[in-house]
Amino acid sequence: LLLGLLAPFALHDILPKFDEELTVYAYEKIWSELSELDRKIVYIISQGVNKTGDIRESLGVSPQLLNTYRKRLMERGVVDGSRHGELTLALPRFEEYINMYCEVTI
């Protein structure tokens, strides 16, 4: 029944509105509350760098420092660290938000 209701709408028709709602009601607030290093880590992940060793190397930080930020970002639900040695974004379409609206200097 639900599929029948959604059938007239193509995904490309509803994604812009979905992205706008995520941006206005969630992602702007989440991004504004991240520290500078949090933002750099999340930005690097959004660029496809997922291995913690590569993230550390990109930022020039120690394993201990990255681990502190990793834990904090996981607790906030921003990143997923369930796979050993890897970090991914946990929020739907957050990568698109970052690439569209956020400027980060590494």
Name each region found by the language model.
Residues 1-24:
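Amphipathic alpha-helical "lid/sensor" segments that cap RecA-like P-loop NTPase cores
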Residues 23-106:
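C-terminal leucine-rich, beta-strand-based interaction scaffolds used for sensing/assembly
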